[in-house]
UniProtKB/Swiss-Prot annotation:
Gene: ribA
EC numbers on record: 3.5.4.25
Cofactor: Zn(2+)
Active-site residue numbers: 126 (proton acceptor), 128 (nucleophile)
Keywords: GTP-binding, Hydrolase, Metal-binding, Nucleotide-binding, Riboflavin biosynthesis, Zinc
GO biological process: riboflavin biosynthetic process
Organism per entry: Pseudomonas entomophila (strain L48)
The organism's taxonomic lineage, starting at the top: Bacteria, Pseudomonadati, Pseudomonadota, Gammaproteobacteria, Pseudomonadales
Catalytic activity from the UniProt record: GTP + 4 H2O = 2,5-diamino-6-hydroxy-4-(5-phosphoribosylamino)-pyrimidine + formate + 2 phosphate + 3 H(+)
Protein name as annotated: GTP cyclohydrolase-2
Gene Ontology CC terms, in alphabetical order: cytosol
């Protein structure tokens, strides 16, 4: 996959001054961003997150999901550590796009869960692809991650690309009455590790 580095700049945030790296996936035209902090190319495991774009949660404060809260918590954790990386991937709505996500929300308003809604629209439950992460991490010199995620598919995707996941760091945040069914469905149907019994597990490739 031809993913090319375009430019980098400083990005001051309330948490830290990150370096923002821009990448272009020439095959899809999608623009992806990495926020980095500190020395991440020293060979040691780097605290990191793969975060798929969620306009409603990240920018519009939606409580239908936990995405915005996870994004903020991940950046705060990296800032506390003084070293880390966050890949912001343009895969809105688990890969189905913004307008289709709104269509899925409409079905959820009628009683469907998040997986059923995607499937009724003709999509897989999760259409995301993480192949673009490899060239971005290689460009930054990152070989091993302490991955902030509840999603075992992200761990497997990285290990399948020979990116070592030294540790899975649970990211449980943003729970509220509006996303209770959504989070339960992610655990029951998508295998997300939402409970304490899963903490510290690293699935083997």
């Amino acid at each position: 996959m031809p993913v090319v580095f375009v430019a980098a700049s400083k990005l001051p945030t309330p948490f830290a001054i990150f370096t923002m790296h821009g990448f272009l996936d020439e095959a899809t035209g999608r623009e992806h961003v990495v926020l980095s902090l500190g020395d991440i190319a020293d060979g040691e495991p780097v605290l990191g997150r793969l975060h798929s774009e969620c306009l409603t949660g990240d920018a519009l404060f939606s409580q239908r999901c936990d995405c915005g809260s996870q994004l903020e918590a991940a950046l705060q954790a990296i800032a506390r550590e003084g070293r880390g990386v966050l890949l912001y991937l343009r895969q809105e709505g688990r890969g189905i796009g913004l307008l289709n996500k709104i269509r899925a929300y409409e079905l959820q308003d009628g009683g469907a869960d998040t997986v059923e809604a995607n499937e009724r629209l003709g999509f897989a439950a999760d259409q995301r692809d993480y192949a673009m992460c490899l060239p971005m991490l290689e460009h930054l010199g990152v070989k091993s991650l302490r991955l902030m995620t509840n999603n075992p598919r992200k761990v497997k995707a990285l290990t399948d690309m020979s990116i070592k996941v030294a540790e899975r760091v649970p990211l449980h945040t943003g729970h509220n009455p509006h996303n209770r069914l959504y989070l339960a469905t992610k655990a029951d149907k998508l295998g997300h590790m939402m409970g304490n019994k899963h903490q510290g597990e690293v699935p083997q490739a």
